[in-house]
Structures are given as C-alpha cells and as structure tokens.
C-alpha cells in the first residue's frame, strides 16, 4: 500500500485543494483515453464544439471506464479521503482542446446530480437538463463531497489549469457579489499527467483560455459518504455498475 503523504491531506483540508501525483501510469492513461475516444457523441450527455468536448453521466455512458479508473492507487486514495461507503455523486469528462477559447468564470460547484425531484427543506434551486435532474443541496452535503480530478494531460497556466482561492471553501456558499473580494488571493494549480487534483466543491475556482496547443483532458469525479434524505439518490450512484 502506498499512502498519501500526510501533508497533502492536510493541505487539502486547509486550502480546499491538493495534488496527488503518480496515481495513473502512462499505459493506464492511454487505456482511459482509448475508451473515451471510441465513444460516439450522441444524446444529451454529450457536448462537442470547437472549444470543448464534454460527457456528463460519464460512467453510465461509458461503463468500461470504471475498472480502469478504480486502480489500486485510486481505491487507496478514495479510502483515505472518505469513509465507506463512497457514493459517486457526479462523473464528467472535459476536453479543453488545443487553442480553446473556453473560459470558466469564478464559481463554486453548488449543484449535484440526483435521480429525481423531491420537495425537501433546504434543497433548491432545481433544474432539469437533458442528462437529468440537478439541485443545490444544503451546505452540509456540499461540505461532505470530495472532488477527484484525474488529469490525463499535464496542465499548467498555458493550457487552462484551474485557478483556485486557497481556504475559500471555509466561507460556505459565497454570494456572487462577494466573489471579487476573494480572487486577489488566487493561484494557479498545475497538475502533471497521471495525477489527481483533490478539491472541495466550495473552493472558488476558474479557468482561463488555453494559450498554447496542448489539450487539457480531465475526468472529474465527485464522491460523498452521505446518504440523501427521503429516498433521494445521487444520480451516478444510482446508475447500474458494469
């Protein structure tokens, strides 16, 4: 067993993000990309333009990815971060192609994917997209989510690495009018290929356009050990595993 350095986990708790290197070997990255590149682009979960290729409900759409993602190092990391059972909250693939002008403004990840709509105290707003139902849950659920971003390419300021505000997750849901007060403390988070960036959903983050010809391909996974109330289920977790 290869344990994650204690200071990395402490950085994650304090700053709201951290990077764990060498989770996937080059051959494992090639295997993941092969499955993704063989996929079609049909249905509401797929979005393909000149600036972005994205797949939502990723593991429901491409179940062959599941055993490739859950290698021994990933399983160890997940167990270090969250007690069992770890529910899959969200799974998305992002490709920021070479020369992309796609910009992501400062935000927190406030919406979660669920299997249906249910009128519950503290849950809302709701929205329904082609891929399913999404809702903003109470803060306690957002605080319990851990995001693991698997980087299939090396990523830095030149090809759209995330900019993050250390410690911003500790301020809860930040009103849009107050975000500018936090961004002067932002920093770029470079991530090597095969590494996993850990992030808390309430960490303020943004992404600039790519400045060079390198792609930035990422598998974005969110997990929680919490159960939702009243029989509501995390949508990805409710999808059948293969």
Predicted ranges, named:
Residues 89, 144, 158-160, 215-219:
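Residues that flank catalytic or metal-binding motifs in active/ligand-binding sites
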Residues 100-190, 228-235:
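Catalytic core of non-heme Fe(II) oxygenases with the double-stranded beta-helix
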Residues 25-26, 94-96, 111, 155-157, ...:
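Short, solvent-exposed loop/turn segments at secondary-structure junctions
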Residues 1-15, 20-129:
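Non-heme Fe(II)-dependent double-stranded beta-helix
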Residues 62-67, 135, 184-185, 207:
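Active-site rim elements
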Residues 19, 87-90, 147, 163-164, ...:
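A structural signal for short, well-ordered beta-strand segments and their strand-loop junctions
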Residues 90-92, 148-150, 219-223:
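A structural signal for short, well-ordered beta-strand segments
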Residues 42, 162, 169-187, 192-198, ...:
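Non-heme Fe(II)/2-oxoglutarate
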């Amino acid at each position: 067993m290869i344990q994650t350095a204690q200071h990395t986990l402490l950085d994650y708790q304090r700053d709201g993000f951290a990077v764990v290197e060498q989770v996937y070997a080059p051959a494992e990255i090639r295997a993941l990309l092969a499955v993704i590149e063989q996929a079609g682009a049909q249905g509401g979960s797929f979005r393909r333009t000149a600036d972005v290729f994205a797949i939502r409900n990723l593991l429901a759409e491409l179940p062959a990815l599941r055993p490739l993602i859950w290698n021994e190092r990933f399983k160890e990391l997940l167990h270090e971060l969250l007690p069992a059972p770890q529910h899959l909250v969200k799974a998305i693939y992002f490709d920021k192609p070479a020369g992309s002008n796609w910009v992501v403004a400062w935000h927190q990840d406030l919406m979660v994917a669920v299997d249906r709509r249910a009128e519950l105290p503290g849950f809302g707003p709701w929205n329904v997209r082609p891929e399913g139902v999404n809702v903003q849950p109470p803060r306690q659920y957002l605080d319990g989510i851990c995001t693991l971003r698997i980087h299939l390419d090396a990523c830095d300021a030149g090809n759209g690495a995330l900019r993050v505000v250390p410690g911003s997750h500790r301020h809860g849901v930040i009103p849009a009018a107050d975000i500018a007060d936090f961004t002067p403390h932002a920093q770029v988070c470079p991530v090597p290929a095969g590494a996993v960036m850990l992030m808390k959903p309430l960490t303020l983050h943004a992404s600039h356009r790519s400045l060079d010809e390198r792609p930035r391909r990422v598998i974005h996974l969110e997990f929680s050990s919490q159960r939702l109330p009243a029989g509501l289920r995390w949508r990805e977790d409710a999808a059948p595993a293969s």
